[in-house]
């Protein structure tokens, strides 16, 4: 370990939420509905689905069947909801320590841990059956594999043990584009993997900027996020590195798209690079920083790229010839 890092205070966070005290069930239907909605984390799902539609449009070289799009989005929502609900069960012990997550349903005991576990498993099984029936077996298998990876590899292993947790664990968040592509074509082609890579490189700057803001929260919970174990200048430098990788990676889609996507990818990439470099410069000078601003603007950046890709694909603009 280099001098850029320091140790994290140890804390026992290995107990599961299933062993938590009996929950106080929500009393009203509206309260119960809100609690279960909180388990699936709708805002996270919304971002994932935004990346699915452009992948399907590019795979179809135009506009695919509306029914296929709806079916894939429904299945993807169920799969993401399953992963998020199971994540809430596994992380209930650290959620109750962190100020940012203390309002979650299992922490407030509006849903029992057992019911949340059953809910998550049911959503996962439902997503498999739904995607198999409405799209194809490959999409269904990829969805279940994503759930298992997110829960057992990221949540239970990587998140609590390594500062690189979000780098490798974030691969689960990249899968909706692959599932969407497979839903249209029945296979996984190179453009799907390129889109996977865009989100893979986007995830660290997005998450580390949030973790910079809530560093004390993560440290209190014993989660070794990079901003917890590394110096701020090292973290901001890594954000710059991954931002460059992300922007350059977006250009790999140029041969499979038209001028509209390429122009927006370059412009949006240049804008986000300026933001990342500005954060790093402020960190190096010891000036006050606003990492949460970068976090929110990273969502804007991804939205711009995805919308440009969707419009470009829907209009079937000239293709330079991607080998697939």
Swiss-Prot record:
Q: Which InterPro entries match?
A: Protohaem_IX_farnesylTrfase, UbiA_prenyltransferase, UbiA_sf
Tell me what topology the record assigns in the membrane. Answer: Multi-pass membrane protein
Q: What is its EC number?
A: 2.5.1.141
An example molecular function term from Gene Ontology annotations: protoheme IX farnesyltransferase activity
One cellular component (GO) term of this entry = plasma membrane
Which pathway is recorded for this entry? Porphyrin-containing compound metabolism; heme O biosynthesis; heme O from protoheme: step 1/1
Query: Which reaction is catalysed here?
Result: heme b + (2E,6E)-farnesyl diphosphate + H2O = Fe(II)-heme o + diphosphate
Q: What else is known?
A: Carbon 2 of the heme B porphyrin ring is defined according to the Fischer nomenclature.
Protein name as annotated: Protoheme IX farnesyltransferase 2
**Native source organism of the sequence:** Saccharopolyspora erythraea (strain ATCC 11635 / DSM 40517 / JCM 4748 / NBRC 13426 / NCIMB 8594 / NRRL 2338)
């Amino acid at each position: 370990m280099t001098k850029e890092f320091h140790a994290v205070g140890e804390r026992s966070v290995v107990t599961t939420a299933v062993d938590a005290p009996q929950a106080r069930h929500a009393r009203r239907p509206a309260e119960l509905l809100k609690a279960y909605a909180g388990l699936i984390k709708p805002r996270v799902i919304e971002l994932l689905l935004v990346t699915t539609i452009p992948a399907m449009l590019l795979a179809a070289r135009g506009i695919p069947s509306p029914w296929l799009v709806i079916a894939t989005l429904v299945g993807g929502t169920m799969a993401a909801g399953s992963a998020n609900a199971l994540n809430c069960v596994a992380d209930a012990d650290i959620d109750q320590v962190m100020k940012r997550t203390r309002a979650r349903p299992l922490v407030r005991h509006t849903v029992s841990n057992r019911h949340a576990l059953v809910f998550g498993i049911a959503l996962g099984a439902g997503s498999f059956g739904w995607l198999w029936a409405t799209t194809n077996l490959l999409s269904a298998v990829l969805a279940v594999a994503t759930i298992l990876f997110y829960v057992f590899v990221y949540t239970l292993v990587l998140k609590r043990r390594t500062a690189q947790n979000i780098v490798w664990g974030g691969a689960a968040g990249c899968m909706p584009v692959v599932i969407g592509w497979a839903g249209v074509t029945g296979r996984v082609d190179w453009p799907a993997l390129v889109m996977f890579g865009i989100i893979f490189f986007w995830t660290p700057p997005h998450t580390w900027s949030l973790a910079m803001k809530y560093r004390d929260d993560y440290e209190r919970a014993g989660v070794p996020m990079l901003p917890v174990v590394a110096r701020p200048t090292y973290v901001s430098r890594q954000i710059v590195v991954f931002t460059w990788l992300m922007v350059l990676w977006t250009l790999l889609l140029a041969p499979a798209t038209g001028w509209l996507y390429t122009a927006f990818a370059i412009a949006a990439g240049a804008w986000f690079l300026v933001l990342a470099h500005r954060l790093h410069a402020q960190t190096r000078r010891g000036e006050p920083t606003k990492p949460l601003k970068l976090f929110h603007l990273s969502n804007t950046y991804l939205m711009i790229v995805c919308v440009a890709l969707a419009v470009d694909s829907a209009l079937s603009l000239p293709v330079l010839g991607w080998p697939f």
